[in-house]
């Protein structure tokens, strides 16, 4: 069974601090200490949050999540926690225990507010006959006692504090809706003992329960009105080190008066050869062993005209990776490491201020510490700059912890030409980069699950290279959930925008064909039945704009054709060709559904387009289909529709493919 079941069985309550939860880029810490006299053989911890959580059990990182969700389709995660017999990993113990959670509320999505929901139960109580995860075997209903009280669940007994260690007013990369904020973390402002069971949290507040209209019991609490289990595996992680130190140098400290909160400005400053700053042992950054010493110059203390020189270095990982940067460092309190990310160099130089201003920074506390950025980034080049380190800052390790969808490579391609094999491997690796807890158009810039990009391009590659269907199924379902009252779907479907007017209508048609292709590939009828109403609503929304020739014309929404220079004025040939393909797909889905009326309606509409297409769009003198025809003077002018004068490869290719 692959239908995504809406879960109404929660004893936990949504909690937050004592604000309205709408603050952007807010980091909130939660703790719940508890004592166990007996430890269950196994337990399950269910958890979700808006927007992203990092979960610890007894000081050990348990996991991160949930998959990026819309408020009306919120994923939750489940963690199996082994009992006292476990020899490794996070586990419960007899006596004092603590669950600690960091939640970042990004706040970019419409109708978003911060919240945390969690509960810990003995395994038999938690599952109640349901799988622990999409990949786990079902747990029999009779493996334990009936449902009882949870061990702990989010409620007013949890402790909460708004963390001052993370700056909220950091630079905002407007084109990224998933991780738009640079992270500025000051380790001096967070006591690392907060993860310990016996930490004194008496100065923290009691958590505030978020109330719904009629109840505070999920799912009766808006905006989280539908809670569903993660339907894809957890991501796999592996440690990767840079291949080369591509640059070492120093820069003169200067005040950023352009965008003072934007780290990418200082990280893009050109460097000179090292003269006064200290960079000792940079090659140690290429392994897990060794030490690299970084320090700012001190010559300015005797000669102020010199200025402060700060060390910079750039690491090349040899390929683009999706990774969390993790540092093991020690040095003087107040020293700051800035980290900039880039996919490519510009004229041989690092400059991420002009494309994607992705950067993070840590200000360290005294002594040795380990830090991991909160959000992964896509990069090949990493540039590090150090401020305020007038005694050596020691980097024991700088590692990129790659996050990857756990694909298995079931697909293969072999050719006698080496170049073709190389191209295939490049494509397969690109698909790996584009696949995480959602499918992105680019993991570097937007991290957006663009409806048309994924449906038209990416899914077929995932099937061919990996034979994987769970991620595709999640995309189809999550995209369907964005359907507006107009019948059209959202453009970016791992986020939510209430702007119903800004839709790409052709993208939605590709989604419809992707649903048909998924059925062809898997033979799974369940998702066809589940998403069929969405498909019908979409088709009816488009057909409402047909003219007397059966062609869609004067579409008020965007017909995008993915950046191509195609004229879509009036009646668009490319769009109507794509619509013909989508109507064929709709007919196939209707037959699976047993809906004879829609089968006939879709086939009839497709036939009308086919009958009119050549007569309206074919230009004999050019030997081509024109991009569009329009009545420039209006419907009642009497002049009729005329070609708009543009011809494109995209239009004529669409006519061939869908004709």
Report residues per predicted region.
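Extracellular/oxidizing-compartment recognition motifs
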Residues: 1-444, 453, 470-473, 491-493, ...
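Secretory-pathway/luminal and periplasmic proteins that interact with or process carbohydrate-rich
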Residues: 54-55, 107-108, 406-408, 485, ...
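A generic structural motif
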Residues: 64, 68-69, 558-559, 632
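Aromatic-rich carbohydrate-recognition surfaces in CAZymes
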Residues: 98-104, 352, 358-394, 416-423, ...
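Solvent-exposed loop and edge beta-strand segments that line ligand/cofactor-binding
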Residues: 314-317, 372, 439-451, 495-508, ...
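Beta-rich carbohydrate-recognition and catalytic domains
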Residues: 342, 474, 600, 604-607
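Short amphipathic alpha-helical coiled-coil/interface segments
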Residues: 535, 602-614
């Amino acid at each position: 069974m692959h239908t995504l079941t809406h879960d109404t069985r929660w004893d936990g309550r949504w909690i937050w601090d004592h604000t309205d939860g709408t603050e952007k880029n807010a980091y909130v810490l939660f703790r719940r200490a508890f004592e166990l006299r007996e430890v269950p053989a196994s337990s399950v911890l269910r958890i979700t949050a808006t927007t992203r959580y990092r979960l610890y059990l007894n000081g050990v990182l348990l996991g991160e999540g949930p998959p990026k969700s819309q408020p009306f389709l919120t994923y939750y995660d489940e963690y199996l926690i082994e009992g006292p017999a476990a020899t490794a990993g996070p586990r419960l113990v007899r006596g004092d225990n603590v669950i600690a959670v960091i939640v970042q509320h990004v706040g970019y999505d419409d109708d978003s507010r911060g919240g945390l929901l969690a509960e810990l139960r003995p395994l038999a109580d938690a599952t109640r006959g349901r799988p622990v995860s999409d990949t786990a075997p079902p747990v029999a209903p009779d493996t334990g006692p009936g449902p009882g009280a949870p061990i702990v669940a989010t409620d007013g007994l949890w402790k909460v504090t708004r963390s001052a260690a993370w700056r909220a007013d950091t630079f905002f990369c407007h084109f990224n809706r998933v991780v738009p904020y640079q992270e500025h973390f000051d380790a001096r402002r967070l006591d690392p003992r907060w993860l310990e069971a016996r930490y004194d949290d008496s100065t923290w507040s009691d958590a505030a329960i978020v109330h719904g209209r009629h109840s505070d019991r999920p799912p009766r609490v808006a905006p989280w009105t539908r809670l569903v289990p993660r339907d894809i595996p957890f991501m796999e992680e592996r440690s990767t080190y840079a291949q080369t130190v591509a640059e070492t140098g120093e820069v003169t400290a200067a005040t950023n008066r352009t965008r003072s909160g934007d780290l990418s400005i200082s990280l893009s400053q050109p460097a000179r050869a090292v003269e006064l700053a200290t960079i000792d042992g940079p090659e140690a950054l290429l392994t897990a062993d060794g030490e690299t010493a970084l320090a700012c110059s001190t010559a300015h203390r005797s000669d102020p005209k010199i200025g402060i020189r700060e060390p910079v270095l750039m690491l090349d990982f040899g390929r683009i990776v999706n990774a969390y940067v993790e540092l093991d460092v020690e040095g003087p309190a107040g020293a700051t490491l800035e980290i900039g990310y880039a996919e490519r160099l510009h004229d041989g130089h690092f400059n991420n201020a002009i494309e994607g201003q992705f950067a993070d920074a840590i200000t360290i506390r005294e002594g040795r510490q380990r830090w991991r950025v909160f959000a992964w980034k896509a990069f090949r080049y990493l540039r590090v700059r150090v401020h305020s380190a007038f005694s050596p800052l020691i980097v024991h390790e700088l590692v990129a912890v790659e996050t990857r969808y756990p694909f298995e490579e079931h697909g293969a391609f072999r050719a006698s030409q080496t170049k073709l094999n190389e191209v295939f491997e490049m494509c397969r690796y690109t698909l790996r980069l584009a696949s995480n807890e959602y499918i992105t158009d680019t993991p570097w810039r937007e991290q957006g699950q663009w409806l048309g990009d994924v449906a038209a391009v990416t899914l077929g590659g995932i099937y061919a290279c990996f034979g994987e269907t769970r991620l595709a199924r999640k995309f189809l379902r999550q995209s369907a959930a964005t359907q507006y009252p107009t019948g059209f779907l959202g453009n970016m479907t791992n986020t939510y925008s209430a702007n119903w007017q800004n839709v790409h209508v052709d993208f939605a048609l590709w989604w419809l064909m992707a649903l048909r292709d998924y059925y062809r590939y898997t033979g799974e009828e369940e998702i066809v039945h589940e998403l069929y109403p969405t498909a019908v609503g979409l088709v009816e929304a488009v057909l409402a704009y047909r003219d007397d020739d059966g062609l869609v014309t004067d579409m008020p929404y965007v017909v995008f054709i993915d950046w191509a220079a195609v004229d879509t004025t009036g009646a668009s040939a490319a769009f109507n060709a794509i619509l013909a393909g989508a109507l064929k797909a709709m007919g196939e889905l209707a037959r699976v559904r047993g809906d004879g009326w829609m089968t006939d309606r879709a086939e009839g509409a497709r036939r009308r387009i086919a009958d009119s297409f050549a007569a309206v769009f074919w230009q004999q003198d050019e030997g081509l289909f024109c991009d569009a025809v329009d009545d420039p003077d209006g419907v009642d002018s009497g002049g009729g529709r005329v070609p708009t004068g543009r011809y494109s490869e995209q239009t004529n290719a669409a006519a061939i493919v869908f004709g």
